[in-house]
């Protein structure tokens, strides 16, 4: 399965954290491409530092639900805490979102594929089109069209 994941960090050494997360993904899957890092303003939440974002494309034998668990384990290994006191859209050492898994459509309590807000997030679409200019998002069409139609959240 080919999967697209977005990576984000705004605490600690974000560039090092994103590189480390990509390396960790490569240990369980094959990283096909990693975008440049993009500095973006946070969306909502409390006042916080800008994010560093990237997109990675992997080839994996994992099922989407297994890949989600791997992504969450990588987040935890980099200091991410998930609990009731976690601030939605708050600062974090690492955030990994599954954006696309082949052309699958998944809507379960644990996982929604494609990511339900990917089509409106410039910080996902811009790095993604850099490494896959012909990319499409199931249900939304070509990434290039989404970027042209704007306005997008940084």
Regions found by a protein language model. Give the residues of each.
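Flexible, gly/pro- and Lys/Arg-enriched active-site loops
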Residues: 35, 43-50, 65-68, 72-154
């Amino acid at each position: 399965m080919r999967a697209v994941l977005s990576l984000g960090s705004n605490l600690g050494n974000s560039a090092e954290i994103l590189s480390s997360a990509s390396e960790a993904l490569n240990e369980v899957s094959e990283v096909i491409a990693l975008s440049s890092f993009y500095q973006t303003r946070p969306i909502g939440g409390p006042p916080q530092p800008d994010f560093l974002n990237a997109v990675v494309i992997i080839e994996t034998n994992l099922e989407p639900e297994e890949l989600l668990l791997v992504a969450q384990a990588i987040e935890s290994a980099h200091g991410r805490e998930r609990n009731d006191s976690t601030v939605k859209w708050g600062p974090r050492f690492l955030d990994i979102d599954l954006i696309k898994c082949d052309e699958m459509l998944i809507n379960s309590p644990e996982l929604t594929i494609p990511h339900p807000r990917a089509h409106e997030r410039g910080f996902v679409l811009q790095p993604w089109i850099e490494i896959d200019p012909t990319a499409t998002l199931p249900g939304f069409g070509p990434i290039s069209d989404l970027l042209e139609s704007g306005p997008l959240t940084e």
